[in-house]
């Protein structure tokens, strides 16, 4: 698919996500990367996602993180990159087979509370072992699946650095991460797969909120160790709890 077609596809998705309430106001951003190229296209800052067009995307050099002047001659005048551009870059730098990134601010992802902090910036949230996990290619019966939750640093670059380090060290089982009190970033090999993954992710988080299916119902902190986890589950980060605001369920 050509760059033009992919940017048109992202523009359509932006309108859909805005309608779904996943990109309220000007929140969130969308990106594509043509595999083998030295950069990626990402939606600019301060744009309403229900009116995106191909001139609303900037080309960013993957290595430097800077705009590529020769690629941005036809973009909308005055368009600037969002600070969250670095989140997309982190995914592309860590995972070289990824061609699309979707960063949205869903309500459910903002209700998640874990034990992250500036000093412990990554936690693991156990996902429910439900059928929709097959969208991610997980076919094992009753799998133990965790998603990383990243601390919402005031400086977005710190979030990006943390995410990139995690993705490089631990091969992700699911194609998304949660940024606490912020939103989710979902990825895929192309726009079709990334969108499919986002729909599945939204369903899972809605399921968890609706059913109050806490990963640790006794409220005890459960830390994986060398003795109580399998090789695939072994991580150097904490397993998250999943408390939510009480008013959420009134």
Swiss-Prot record:
It is an enzyme of class 4 (lyase). It comes from Leptospira borgpetersenii serovar Hardjo-bovis (strain JB197). Pathway: Amino-acid biosynthesis; L-methionine biosynthesis via salvage pathway; L-methionine from S-methyl-5-thio-alpha-D-ribose 1-phosphate: step 2/6. This is Methylthioribulose-1-phosphate dehydratase. It catalyses: 5-(methylsulfanyl)-D-ribulose 1-phosphate = 5-methylsulfanyl-2,3-dioxopentyl phosphate + H2O. Binds 1 zinc ion per subunit. Its EC number is 4.2.1.109. The lineage of its organism: Bacteria, Pseudomonadati, Spirochaetota, Spirochaetia, Leptospirales. Keywords: Amino-acid biosynthesis, Lyase, Metal-binding, Methionine biosynthesis, Zinc.
